[in-house]
Swiss-Prot record:
InterPro entries: 2-IPM_HCS-like (IPR050073), 4OH_2_O-val_aldolase (IPR017629), Aldolase_TIM (IPR013785), DmpG_comm (IPR012425), DRE_TIM_HOA (IPR035685), PYR_CT (IPR000891). GO terms for biological process: catabolic process; L-leucine biosynthetic process. It is an enzyme of class 4 (lyase). HAMAP family: HOA. The lineage of its organism: Bacteria, Bacillati, Actinomycetota, Actinomycetes, Mycobacteriales. This is 4-hydroxy-2-oxovalerate aldolase 2.
Length: 333
């Protein structure tokens, strides 16, 4: 039987959906519910990872440390996880997260820049952490190129490497090709993960295809709480996993209750496929650009979709949020 590792991202990717505004009390409540529902791991951080709170990415209502401490106090069995983007988060932040109880780290880079993760992956392994490599915007590299980058992360020490569909742009054949390419080059003991977004309404389908091709770590969030149209909805994926007979440790009804009772009430903007979020996937734009693009569109009185299409044409990547204002200004003149 296929046995899955369910990695919740409600309290990290989900931060984008609420502009990184959530109290430690709410974090603890959600983390406790997730553990009770049986997820293997719970990721906690600013949406852009450790030290992501900034003018460019958006300040958080609290520090990463306050959120992590709240989650650490609330869980005992689920593995506390966080995300780090080299260039934003540093080895110092990694060590501090470890001191607060984080035992799993995902080290993220643009899909063609795995080389910048070596120091952080190596340090995490020295600390004894579970380490995953996170190749963002995986649609922007061919399956072969992506697999080469995944192999680099493996040589640095990653236990798992993800196909990370940050733009919600991958289709099912594209996911299949990328996971197969990973499996062809990675050692048999190295796990493969899938991080899907719902922008094209394919997050569950793409996650299923990934599992069929050998992925075992699945990123998902309560009510799909995440950037853009959201992540793979945890409760929906678990229901499908049950229908496929795949092994996991989750309680479907408990996930449904947590999604509807704890997470949906947090939304100040619906997390769904709509004209703006669909355009993210159609254009292949980083999902976390949504709220930044909407703000720029309102400021300069232009259609947010036009901004997103141009961002896709320019192949903008994470960290270039400021360019959305430049695009909006150009469109308004």
């Amino acid at each position: 039987m296929t046995q899955l590792y369910i990695q919740d991202v409600t309290l990290r990717d989900g931060m984008h959906a609420i502009r990184h505004q959530i109290s430690p009390t709410a974090v603890a409540r959600i983390a406790s519910a997730l553990e009770a529902a049986g997820v293997n791991a719970i990721e906690v951080a600013h949406g852009d990872g450790l030290a992501g709170g900034s003018v460019n990415y958006g300040p958080g209502s609290n520090t990463d440390w306050e959120w992590i401490e709240a989650a650490a106090d609330a869980v005992t069995t689920a593995k506390l996880t966080t995300l780090l983007l080299p260039g934003i988060g540093t080895v110092a932040e990694l060590k501090r997260a470890y001191s607060l109880g984080v035992r799993s780290i995902r080290v993220a880079a643009h899909c063609t820049e795995a080389d910048i993760t070596a120091q952080h992956i190596t340090m995490a392994r020295e600390l004894g952490m579970d380490v995953s490599g996170f190749l963002m915007l995986s649609h922007m590299a061919s399956a072969e190129t992506l697999a080469e980058q995944a192999k680099l992360m493996e040589t640095f020490g990653a236990h798992c490497v993800y196909v990370t569909d940050s733009g919600g742009r991958l289709t099912m054949p594209m996911v299949r090709d990328r996971v197969r390419a990973y499996r062809d080059v990675l050692d048999s003991h190295t796990e493969i993960g899938i991080h899907a977004h719902e922008n094209l309404s394919l997050s569950v389908a793409n996650s299923v295809v990934a599992v069929e091709e050998g992925a075992t770590r699945i990123d998902a969030s309560l009510a799909g709480h995440g950037a853009g149209a959201g992540n793979c909805p945890l409760e929906a994926f678990v229901a499908v996993a049950d229908l496929h007979g795949w092994g996991h440790s989750c309680d479907l009804f408990a996930l449904q209750d947590a999604a509807d009772d704890l997470v949906r009430p947090l939304h100040d903007r619906p997390v769904r496929v709509d004209r703006e979020t669909l355009t993210l996937g159609y254009a292949g734009v980083y999902s976390s650009f949504l709220r930044h693009a909407e703000a720029a569109a309102q400021r300069y009185d232009v259609d947010v979709r036009s901004i997103l299409i141009e961002a896709g044409r320019r192949r903008l990547v994470g960290g270039q949020e400021d360019m959305l204002v430049d695009i909006a200004l150009s469109l308004s003149t």
